[in-house]
Curated annotation (Swiss-Prot):
Known function: Tachykinins are active peptides which excite neurons, evoke behavioral responses, are potent vasodilators and secretagogues, and contract (directly or indirectly) many smooth muscles. Hemokinin induces plasma extravasation, mast cell degranulation, muscle contraction, salivary secretion and scratching behavior. Increases sperm motility. Induces potent analgesic effects and may play a role in pain modulation. Promotes survival of bone marrow B lineage cells and of cultured LPS-stimulated pre-B cells and may act as an autocrine factor required for B-cell survival and proliferation.
GO annotations of cellular component type: extracellular space
Region of interest: Disordered: 107-170
The name this protein goes by in its record: Tachykinin-4
GO BP: detection of temperature stimulus involved in sensory perception of pain; inflammatory response; mast cell degranulation; negative regulation of sensory perception of pain; negative regulation of systemic arterial blood pressure; positive regulation of cytosolic calcium ion concentration; positive regulation of flagellated sperm motility; positive regulation of saliva secretion
Top-level taxon of the source organism: Eukaryota
Organism name: Rattus norvegicus
Annotated signal sequence range: 1-16
């Protein structure tokens, strides 16, 4: 009740001053049209179109970021489909040659899962178990079709899931 009384006391003088000022002002032709439009509630078509365009663009930006559907735009895909697409991208990057390892150390191991991201997942898990950071010889590079990869692919096994970096010995 007290905030309502304070609000009424603040608004009262403001309303009385604006009604007095309105009588004293002389309006031009443009000002009168704006006042009558605002008082009657009849919108001007060109202004309404511009406001709608502004509102649409901001709405589209917001809902696009939030993943909601706006006028035929599909929401963000589920995690399952995104995972499948990520695996597909990894397969496309690897191509038919698989992985190449920098340096001369190679180790063939049998892995249970030979899916598209199995090597990367297993190498991350093996690095988490170590207390020391990996050195430059343990760096795994993707083959992107260079001449060096053509020579090393003849010696390396065809299955990319069997290639793991060997820890260096001091």
């Amino acid at each position: 009740m007290l905030p309502l009384l304070a609000l009424f006391l603040l608004i009262g003088p403001a309303v009385s001053t604006t009604t007095r000022d309105r009588e004293d002002l002389t309006f031009g032709a443009e000002a009168e049209s704006w006042v009558t439009v605002n008082l009657k509630g009849i919108p001007v078509p060109s202004i309404e179109l511009k406001l709608q365009e502004l509102k649409r663009s901001r709405t589209r930006q917001f809902y696009g970021l939030m993943g909601k559907r706006v006028e035929g735009v599909h929401p963000i895909q589920s995690a399952e489909r995104t995972g499948y697409q990520l695996g597909r991208i990894v397969q496309d990057l690897l191509g038919t040659r698989g992985l190449s390892i920098e340096g001369s150390c190679r180790q063939e191991t049998n892995h249970q899962s030979a899916g598209p991201g199995a090597v990367a997942r297993e190498s991350l898990q093996s690095q988490r178990g170590r207390s020391e950071p990996p050195n430059h010889q343990q760096h795994v590079a993707l083959s992107l079709g260079t001449e060096e990869d053509d020579q090393s692919s003849e010696r390396a096994p065809r299955d990319a899931s069997q290639m793991m970096p060997r820890p260096s010995r001091p």
